[in-house]
Swiss-Prot record:
<dbReference type="InterPro" id="IPR050077">
    <property type="entry name" value="LexA_repressor"/>
</dbReference>
<feature type="DNA-binding region" description="H-T-H motif">
    <location>
        <begin position="27"/>
        <end position="47"/>
    </location>
</feature>
<keyword id="KW-0678">Repressor</keyword>
<keyword id="KW-0742">SOS response</keyword>
<keyword id="KW-0234">DNA repair</keyword>
<dbReference type="InterPro" id="IPR036388">
    <property type="entry name" value="WH-like_DNA-bd_sf"/>
</dbReference>
<dbReference type="GO" id="GO:0004252">
    <property type="term" value="F:serine-type endopeptidase activity"/>
</dbReference>
<dbReference type="GO" id="GO:0003677">
    <property type="term" value="F:DNA binding"/>
</dbReference>
<dbReference type="GO" id="GO:0006260">
    <property type="term" value="P:DNA replication"/>
</dbReference>
<dbReference type="GO" id="GO:0009432">
    <property type="term" value="P:SOS response"/>
</dbReference>
<keyword id="KW-0378">Hydrolase</keyword>
<dbReference type="InterPro" id="IPR039418">
    <property type="entry name" value="LexA-like"/>
</dbReference>
<dbReference type="InterPro" id="IPR006199">
    <property type="entry name" value="LexA_DNA-bd_dom"/>
</dbReference>
<comment type="subunit">
    <text>Homodimer.</text>
</comment>
<dbReference type="InterPro" id="IPR006197">
    <property type="entry name" value="Peptidase_S24_LexA"/>
</dbReference>
<keyword id="KW-0238">DNA-binding</keyword>
<dbReference type="GO" id="GO:0006508">
    <property type="term" value="P:proteolysis"/>
</dbReference>
């Protein structure tokens, strides 16, 4: 869609004012911002922007200028229901119904386009040095292998899912917490359930 430089300036000014203040500028303020002394000239540009579907005006209200694209930006993002796992049943797929505690509506973009993902709610402070806090939910891509140093969700001998940094060493596996006060978990065998690819934190 082609608009003039002046119309672009007016459009961007209205958009910035709405974002910053929560309401649109007056015609006088628009004129001052873009160097137009005549209010009728400003009205003319607004009419052209409205005709091109970029704004909507209410003639009964002086400041009722609506930026239509802001409605699009403010739309609720698509969500996907991601399973949250708890105690893991040995020999069962990680997302088997026996392992799922509940489903969490995650904004689709946070799943990074992955389809085989699950979430694990962090209990405790074993990963605080990695910025993963008690109560956070990690987003995990299902996979059964990992590279040394990657943060994974693995299954312990007690069939509990745990989030740790993974290391394969000479004759054992080390699941390393990111907390200087805690000792690593040393295992002869380890079952990797997935790699951590993201984090969800509720700050309310």
């Amino acid at each position: 869609m082609k608009i003039s430089k002046r119309q672009q300036d007016i459009y961007e000014f209205i958009k910035s004012e709405v974002k910053e203040k929560g309401y649109p500028p007056s015609v006088r303020e628009i004129g001052e911002a873009v160097g137009l002394a005549s209010s009728s000239t400003v009205h003319g540009h607004l009419a052209r922007l409205e005709g091109k579907g970029l704004i909507r005006r209410d003639p009964t209200k002086p400041r009722a200028i609506e930026i239509l694209s802001l409605e699009d930006e403010a739309e609720t993002p698509n969500v996907v229901n991601i399973p949250i796992i708890g105690k893991v049943t040995a020999g069962m797929p990680i997302t088997a119904i026996e392992n799922i505690e509940e489903y969490f509506p995650l904004p689709e973009y946070m799943a990074a386009g992955e389809t085989n993902v699950f979430m694990l709610e962090i209990d405790g402070e074993s990963m605080i040095n990695a910025g993963i806090l008690d109560g956070d939910k990690v987003i995990v891509r299902q996979q059964n292998s990992a590279i040394n140093g990657e943060i994974v969700v693995a299954m312990t001998d007690e069939n509990e899912a745990t989030c740790k940094r993974f290391y394969k060493e000479a004759n054992h596996f080390r699941l390393q917490p990111e907390n200087d006060a805690l000792e690593p978990i040393i295992l002869n065998n380890v079952t990797i359930l997935g790699k951590v690819i993201g984090l969800y934190r509720d700050i309310r």
